[in-house]
Every structure is written in structure tokens, then in C-alpha cells.
């Protein structure tokens, strides 16, 4: 006999239904503990392949593996109860064919129990998105600046800022929506373009360096907490935890070296005889 939880987790259809409504709040998380904190205030949690930068110190997200994403996705699911958890599909796990994408996405859903996957690309990935959604896998799209394409782009630069550069990005947005994605991340595009895309398509847009007019926003948690040395322009720091963490580590090191720690209150005495 199983005991059913009374806690209801948000789903992809819940997020889809927020189009044009209250803004969708989303942050990244890679650990159970931070997920439990983010879960209290956010509608969705993204287990982003940015974990390659944040956790592993990679310069790009390209080296991230499917196994890394599954491991951290499972941790975030264990730490959260309410938010929709979306796990990134890493570079090399979905581009070769629709079938490869399905097998990778199915592994993510089966092994993490998350509610959706996210993949990068617009027109070029539309058939893949449709293939997944038709087989019961909720997909969040990602257009504009696509970090997994860094070796093609050459640098992490905002998109759609030049005259005549909007059309391909608009086409990507339409393709993702028409393919059945329940929402789409719009990253680092000119603000008027982010606004136009939001008005143009029928699914929620989740902005990151796009526009306040988007249906929601997402940031990397460590960026907004002040733990990243050089965050992108679009990041607002809501905390400055770096100096506080450094001060705590410094204080610990000093007390260990001076033998001030552990103190009497931190050690165990002998039990008295009855």
C-alpha cells in the first residue's frame, strides 16, 4: 500500500497556462539544499548545464555530460517539492537524431523524475521538439544566445542587436512554439526583440537578458547571489555572499591554527558513572 503525498508539484501545463498572466519565476539549482530554498519562492527550477561552469569550472557548457545532468537533476528533485524541475539536455545528447534525443530525454525523466527537459535551438531542432512532445516528453525551448553553440558563435554576445538580424530569431521562436514546446527561454537578445517575441508566440517566454515584458525570468542562482566573479550584464546581484563566505572560511582557518577551535562546547566529555 502506498501513501500518496498531498503536496502537488507544478507541471509543464501549469507553466504553459501562465502565458500573459503572473510572471513565472525561475532560478537554477544543482543541489538538494539550494533546491529546497529556491523551491519556496519559484515556480520552476532549472537544472542547467551551467553546472559545468559553476560546479566544475569549465569555460563553456560543452564538456557537460548526460550523466552529470542526471545526477544533479535527481538531487534537485529530492530537495524540492513544489516547483517544476526542468533538466537541460547537454551538448551531444540530442543533436544527432530525433531518436537519440528521445532516448536521452527519456533517461533524464526516468532517472531523475523531473517534469521536463530543455534543449537549445529553434528551426533546426523543431522536428526533434515535435518528436519528443508527441511521445509524452515536455520540452522547454531555448533561443537567442545558445551557449552550447559557443564554438560556432565565437563568443557569448547578445543577439538581434544589428539591423536586419531579427528574422532568424523570430523564426526560431515560431518554430519552437509550433513544434509543441510548453515554453521557451529567450537569452541575451535586444530588448525590443524579446518584447516582440513574447507578443508574437502563444507559449510563455522565459527571459534571461531579454525583456521585462517576457512571461517570466530565469537567472543562474550563483550569479544573483554574488558568487560569480564576472557575471553577465543581464545579472542583477540580489546578494553578495562571496565576501561573507570568504570571511567565514578565513575565521575558521585562523581558529584552527590558533587551536581556538574546537572549543569546550564543541567536544564530547566522558559520561559520568551512574
From Swiss-Prot:
It is found in: Cytoplasm. SUPFAM superfamilies: Phosphoenolpyruvate/pyruvate domain. Its EC number is 2.1.2.11. Pathway: Cofactor biosynthesis; (R)-pantothenate biosynthesis; (R)-pantoate from 3-methyl-2-oxobutanoate: step 1/2. It comes from Rhodopseudomonas palustris (strain ATCC BAA-98 / CGA009). GO terms for cellular component: cytoplasm. It is an enzyme of class 2 (transferase). GO terms for biological process: pantothenate biosynthetic process. Homodecamer; pentamer of dimers. Mg(2+) binds at residues 49, 88, 120. It catalyses: 3-methyl-2-oxobutanoate + (6R)-5,10-methylene-5,6,7,8-tetrahydrofolate + H2O = 2-dehydropantoate + (6S)-5,6,7,8-tetrahydrofolate. GO terms for molecular function: 3-methyl-2-oxobutanoate hydroxymethyltransferase activity; magnesium ion binding. 3-methyl-2-oxobutanoate binds at residues 49-50, 88, 118. The active site is at residue 187. This is 3-methyl-2-oxobutanoate hydroxymethyltransferase. Binds 1 Mg(2+) ion per subunit. Belongs to the PanB family. It comes from the Bacteria. Its cofactor is Mg(2+). Keywords: Cytoplasm, Magnesium, Metal-binding, Pantothenate biosynthesis, Transferase. Disulfide bonds: none annotated. Coiled coil: none annotated.
